[in-house]
């Protein structure tokens, strides 16, 4: 091989394919909270299909199951993990405004 052709040939890296997030025996159902909670973000949002690595049909079923669980109040609509602490109230200097009288 010529040197110029060798520069363009890259070695192929082997990659390990990740396991699918939903196994064949898993039932996508609103009662299966362990499965559903894997597809929700920390904020309580439904994660996208690319992030989940799901098929279109699986994503649709997951979305429906999450919405059913929210309606039946098994899942919260918003997941506020952050507890807002009461910050020390900043001392406001309130000055009384004097009314200006126009003659």
Swiss-Prot record:
Pfam families the record matches: Ribosomal_S18
SUPFAM superfamilies listed in its UniProt record: Ribosomal protein S18
Superkingdom field: Eukaryota
Principal cellular location given in the protein's record: plastid
KW Ribonucleoprotein (keyword) present: yes
UniProt GO cellular component terms: chloroplast; mitochondrial small ribosomal subunit
One example of a Gene Ontology biological process annotation: translation
Keyword line: Chloroplast, Plastid, Ribonucleoprotein, Ribosomal protein, RNA-binding, rRNA-binding
Keyword Ribonucleoprotein attached: yes
Single annotated GO MF: structural constituent of ribosome
Listed PANTHER family: 30S RIBOSOMAL PROTEIN S18 (PTHR13479), SMALL RIBOSOMAL SUBUNIT PROTEIN BS18M (PTHR13479:SF40)
Assembly and interaction partners: Part of the 30S ribosomal subunit.
NCBIfam families on file: S18
Stated name of the protein: Small ribosomal subunit protein bS18c
Organism: Glycine max
Gene name of the record: rps18
């Amino acid at each position: 091989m010529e040197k110029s052709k060798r520069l363009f040939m890259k070695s192929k890296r082997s990659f390990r394919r990740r396991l699918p997030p939903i196994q064949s025996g898993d039932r996508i159902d609103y009662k299966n909270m362990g499965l559903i909670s894997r597809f929700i973000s920390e904020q309580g949002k439904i994660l996208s299909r690319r992030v989940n690595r799901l098929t279109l049909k699986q994503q649709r079923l997951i979305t429906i199951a999450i919405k059913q669980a929210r309606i039946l109040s098994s899942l919260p609509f918003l997941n506020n993990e952050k507890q807002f602490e009461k910050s020390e109230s900043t001392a406001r200097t309130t000055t009384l405004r004097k009314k200006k009288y126009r003659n």
